Amino acid sequence: MAFRMSRDHADFVAHGGTEWDDGAFVNVKKIKIFHDWAGITLVQFDYIDGTGAIVSGLDHGTEPFQFDREHGRVPVEGARAEFWLRDDEYITIVTAFGGYCVRKIEFITNKRTFDFGGFN
């Protein structure tokens, strides 16, 4: 997963990651985060387009998984978090913490703060 901060701050791109852009939309409606023991593995945004419809952005990263001897690659339970933004709410600040990978990501809106991960 990669994340690039605003132009007036230093760039932050996780090791091996690439910068991404979901395009132009009216507003962010929902943010979905997957994480595992190492940190944030996937970020996905739902947007409101110009007609008022909800559009799902691309998955940036991969869902966390573990290996099971009987079933192979299986999803990790409880490793997903998401939040919906209210109609009058918008993101003002995004902060990511990490080095080799994104360990924690924080979204601050005009009304609330959401933390994902747990490592500073």
Swiss-Prot record:
<dbReference type="InterPro" id="IPR001229">
    <property type="entry name" value="Jacalin-like_lectin_dom"/>
</dbReference>
<dbReference type="Pfam" id="PF01419">
    <property type="entry name" value="Jacalin"/>
</dbReference>
<protein>
    <recommendedName>
        <fullName>Jacalin-related lectin 39</fullName>
    </recommendedName>
</protein>
<keyword id="KW-0430">Lectin</keyword>
<feature type="domain" description="Jacalin-type lectin">
    <location>
        <begin position="6"/>
        <end position="120"/>
    </location>
</feature>
<dbReference type="InterPro" id="IPR036404">
    <property type="entry name" value="Jacalin-like_lectin_dom_sf"/>
</dbReference>
<dbReference type="GO" id="GO:0030246">
    <property type="term" value="F:carbohydrate binding"/>
</dbReference>
<comment type="similarity">
    <text>Belongs to the jacalin lectin family.</text>
</comment>
